[in-house]
From Swiss-Prot:
Description of how the protein assembles with itself and partners: Binds ribosomal protein uS19.
Role description: An accessory protein needed during the final step in the assembly of 30S ribosomal subunit, possibly for assembly of the head region. Essential for efficient processing of 16S rRNA. May be needed both before and after RbfA during the maturation of 16S rRNA. It has affinity for free ribosomal 30S subunits but not for 70S ribosomes.
Subcellular location, principal: cytoplasm
Subcellular localization: Cytoplasm
One GO biological process term: rRNA processing
Keywords: Chaperone, Cytoplasm, Ribosome biogenesis, rRNA processing
Family designation: Belongs to the RimM family.
Keyword Glycosyltransferase applies: no
GO CC annotation, single: ribosome
Originating organism: Limosilactobacillus reuteri (strain DSM 20016) (Lactobacillus reuteri)
Protein name per UniProt: Ribosome maturation factor RimM
Domain PRC barrel intervals: 94-167
GO molecular function, one term: ribosome binding
Pfam hit, one: PRC
Source organism phylogeny: Bacteria, Bacillati, Bacillota, Bacilli, Lactobacillales
Length: 168
């Protein structure tokens, strides 16, 4: 089964078994909802953890898992990734994509020039920014806006962009 990262446990919180999670998903309310199962990446098989409660606190998501009732139970989870199974991913609207679908796509301009591959996605504020790794040049930062991104073709594994003045 495939799993996708939705956050990282960065620390424990309090003594009653809560963990502090740095979320890496755009769907915080859905992913960290009571009753959902997340998987802890560890050596061997991912460990399924059912969410008992969740709340926001100072930019983090505080999560309590069923059956883990004190700090000693969850201390071992620190610095581990939390994942969701591919089966649990919600279908997205047209024109919306999961990060794992975008990373690795080839990038071409509207006139057919190959620019490189998307290696990372940044979320600095108003819109995402795709980091395009280019051979023998520094990385290109592409804002994900309609004026720049013209087409995403997941079947053919490429994105068509129109470079605005000053981007390259």
């Amino acid at each position: 089964m495939e799993y996708y990262n939705v956050g990282k446990i960065v620390n424990t919180h309090g003594v009653r078994g809560e963990v502090r999670v740095l979320a890496t998903t755009d769907f915080i309310d859905e992913r960290f909802a009571k009753g959902n199962t997340l998987y802890l990446q560890q050596s061997g098989e991912p460990l399924p953890l059912t969410i008992e409660s969740t709340r926001q606190h100072k930019g983090f998501v505080l999560v309590k898992f069923v059956g883990y009732d004190n700090i000693n139970d969850v201390e071992q989870f620190r610095d581990h990734e939390l994942m969701v199974s591919a089966d649990d991913q919600q279908p997205l609207d047209d024109g919306q994509y999961y990060y794992h679908q975008i990373i690795g796509l080839d990038v071409e301009t509207t006139d057919g020039r190959h620019l490189g591959k998307i290696k990372e996605i940044l979320s600095p504020g108003a819109n995402d920014v795709w980091v395009v790794e280019r051979p023998e040049k520094r990385d290109l930062l592409l804002p994900v806006i309609d004026e720049v991104v013209k087409n995403v073709d997941l079947d053919k594994n490429f994105v068509t962009v129109e470079l605005m003045e000053g981007l390259e």
